[in-house]
């Protein structure tokens, strides 16, 4: 199992020691052109997690490859995955085409970007365009909105995806004391512990549909949470919102994982893989 961060939940330039505790650092989503992002406030705490409406703020592809990536590479010894975003298939593909293979281990395609249709055929179109543009491994990152998980997973696999990441945030809204949205933009992406049941269901359904590697994320804060992701079929696990509150979360989750497995009768977490699929035979690449 590899331990990753969810894209956008960790700045390795300001907290390299946290990133070094992970097996893989996933960058913020990079788009072809620089983006300022949404107006503040764009983050709000909730009872069960947090909302964000960052708006894909990033320096743009050229500046990222020229300035940010070399700095990340100088600070980190582990794998770096680039989160790729865009507003059309060719925008994704062009960033993949420009990605320096010697500096990156994989590309995670953020298929939940604004104006991107999340229908299976649309997701597959983006993956196919990126597959034609790069030999780097491609992980398709999916949201839990408005699609059949298995159908979408099968579509992106047929289009050339090498792995699946899920889930991205749920759309949510909170109100302040004056009954106005706490975020300037209105609704935002909801994440945190309360997202875990949604994420587990998505990982479980995805594993029934594919033998590809799966990065499970959404509400993971403890070793037990990570074990549940593995039991549902995740080969790797990512930490998200917890990183904002606990910089020691990677070490803590990793240390607690096998204890959590032993608590339910497994010698280690590896033996719990797909335990939630006891009724069917599961094969994994």
Question: What do the predicted segments below correspond to?
Answer:
Residues 1-80, 86:
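N-terminal capping/small domains of soluble enzymes
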Residues 1-4, 75-82, 133-144, 207-217:
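Short beta-strand/loop segments at the ligand-binding rim of alpha/beta enzyme cores
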Residues 5, 25, 64, 82, ...:
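Conserved, mostly hydrophobic/aromatic
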Residues 8-9, 83-87, 142-148, 167, ...:
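Glycine-rich beta-to-alpha transition loops that act as phosphate-gripper elements at the mouths
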Residues 14-19, 90-101, 146-159, 204-210, ...:
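Catalytic cores of alpha/beta
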Residues 28-32, 106-113, 163-173, 219-220, ...:
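Glycine-rich phosphate-binding active-site loops on the catalytic face of alpha/beta enzymes
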Residues 50-51, 58, 111-121, 152-212:
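Glycine/Thr-rich beta-alpha phosphate-binding loop at enzyme active sites
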Residues 190-210, 221-285:
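Alpha/beta catalytic cores of nucleotide-metabolism and tRNA/nucleoside-modifying enzymes
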């Amino acid at each position: 199992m590899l331990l990753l961060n969810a894209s956008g939940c960790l700045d390795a330039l300001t907290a390299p020691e946290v990133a070094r505790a992970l097996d893989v650092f996933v960058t913020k989503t990079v788009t072809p052109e620089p983006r300022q992002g949404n107006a503040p406030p764009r983050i709000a705490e909730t009872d069960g997690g947090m909302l964000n409406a960052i708006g894909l703020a990033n320096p743009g592809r050229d500046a990222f490859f020229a300035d940010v990536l070399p700095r990340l590479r100088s600070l980190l010894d582990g794998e770096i995955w680039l989160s790729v975003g865009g507003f059309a298939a060719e925008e994704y593909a062009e960033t993949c085409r420009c990605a320096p293979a010697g500096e990156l281990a994989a590309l995670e395609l953020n298929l939940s970007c604004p104006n991107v249709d999340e229908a299976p055929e649309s997701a597959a179109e983006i993956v196919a365009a990126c597959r034609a543009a790069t030999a780097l491994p491609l992980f398709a990152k999916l949201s839990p909105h408005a699609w059949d998980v298995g159908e979408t997973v099968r579509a992106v696999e047929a289009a050339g995806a090498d792995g699946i990441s899920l889930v991205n945030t749920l759309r949510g809204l909170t109100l302040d004391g004056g009954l106005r949205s706490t975020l300037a933009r209105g609704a935002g992406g909801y994440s945190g512990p309360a997202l875990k049941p949604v994420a587990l269901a998505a990982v479980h359904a995805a594993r029934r549909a594919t033998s590809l590697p799966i990065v499970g994320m959404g509400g993971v804060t403890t070793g037990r949470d990570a074990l549940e992701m593995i039991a549902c079929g995740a080969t790797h696990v990512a930490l998200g919102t917890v990183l904002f509150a606990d910089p020691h979360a990677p070490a803590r989750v990793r240390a607690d994982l096998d204890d959590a497995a032993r608590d339910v009768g497994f010698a280690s977490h590896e033996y719990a893989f797909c335990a939630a699929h006891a009724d069917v035979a599961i094969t994994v690449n």
